[in-house]
Amino acid sequence: MSRKLFRNGRIFTPTDRGVPLAGKHQGDVIHIPRGAIYAKDGVIEAVGDEREVLAGISAGQVDEEIDCRGYCVIPGFVDPHTHMCFAKTREEEFLLRIEGMEYLEILGRGGGILSSVRAARAATEDELFAFTRKHVMTALGLGTTTLEIKSGYGLDTESELRMLRVIERIGRETPLDVVPTFLGAHAIPEEHVAHPDGYVDLVVHEMLPAVARHSGAVFCDVFCEAGVFSVAQSRRVLEAARGVGLELKIHTDEVHDLGGSALAAELRATSAEHLLRTSETNLRAMAEAGVVGILLPATAYSLRRRYAPARRMVELGLPVAVATDCNPGTAYTESMPFVYGLAVLGMGLSMQEALVAATLNGAYAIGQGGRVGSLEVGKSADFLLLDGKSPAILAYHIGVSPVVEVYKQANPMRQWEGITGDHP
């Protein structure tokens, strides 16, 4: 048994109401100026004002005491949308984009996702694991303690299953909690471009049953966008996914308001992601259906597009989460501190709203709200020490990470091989 007491921290944490926080509750964050956390075997047993926590335990109940030195203490980041499982970067496409070429044009030339597909298919499982682990450990050093990772660079049954095996191995062999998502409907592979409905048939009739039998995938996602998968095709995939026991996610309204957000509301998907072009009608529909909107400001920043209307989403009662969208093409970042800063400075969220978006709502967006995302009794002792007076330091101190230490299940993470971060 391991019993640890963390003292002298400025605690900021969302308050979990059992559902994603939305509307006037999006910024429900409590501040404990001198707080303490008592954890037993990695689970929080007490949290609150230091004097009150100390009054509830005896010296014999503490194996180790850690002084948080007045640092800001927040929950570990939950990154609910990543594509960290890939085999090579795409710097050459970045140069094309900054010269003005649109992403869908790059995709039409066989670049974009299709470039990553060729690389992933050619990579061995160990090569793919090593590349993925590098990015996951970078994320850990920057404060992410739970994350989702999608497949989607295989686009055939064997390659998609290989990616999911790698993602599951990442969850076993790194300290992070990893939620696998099947994204076989990420793009139409080159061999099916003349018959896209035939590829949808493959996803529905071959891939999804195989994923359900042979992988630990929790979610199924689909890229519902002009030139990729139509609303009708996306519906086929998502309904089939639900039929084999997977929860639902959808990439939609990144470039065009195609109607994927309305589909998300109709199917009561767990989340809808991107949402740069979503109509107010569909935002309201998703809010009523309890869909979490996962916003990806680093992608908008990288593509030099307008940000998703986060402020309006909060006003309409849509639960907002934020994520890195870490991928080799349009958002090559593992940094949730950077994303938090963009949420505040680019999308207009308050310090408290952005903290909820980067922690508790992200947890609910991947089915982990009961375990992580806030510092409360019964949850995993996953938290960060920040060199600042409040979480605002994440947006205020531009371009660096203020993360001093990362704790996962009350264990310090800095000793892990491969972990990186800006702070000494």
From Swiss-Prot:
UniProt-annotated binding residues for Fe(3+): 81, 83, 251, 325
Cofactor binding note: Binds 1 zinc or iron ion per subunit.
Major subcellular location class: cytoplasm
Annotated positions binding N-formimidoyl-L-glutamate: 153, 327, 329
E.C. code: 3.5.2.7
InterPro entries: Amidohydro-rel, HutI, Metal-dep_hydrolase_composite, Metal_Hydrolase
GO molecular function, one term: zinc ion binding
Reactions catalysed, as given in the entry: 4-imidazolone-5-propanoate + H2O = N-formimidoyl-L-glutamate
Subcellular location: Cytoplasm
Positions with a binding annotation for Zn(2+): 81, 83, 251, 325
The family this protein is said to belong to: Belongs to the metallo-dependent hydrolases superfamily. HutI family.
Function, in words: Catalyzes the hydrolytic cleavage of the carbon-nitrogen bond in imidazolone-5-propanoate to yield N-formimidoyl-L-glutamate. It is the third step in the universal histidine degradation pathway.
Name of this protein: Imidazolonepropionase
Species per Swiss-Prot/TrEMBL record: Syntrophobacter fumaroxidans (strain DSM 10017 / MPOB)
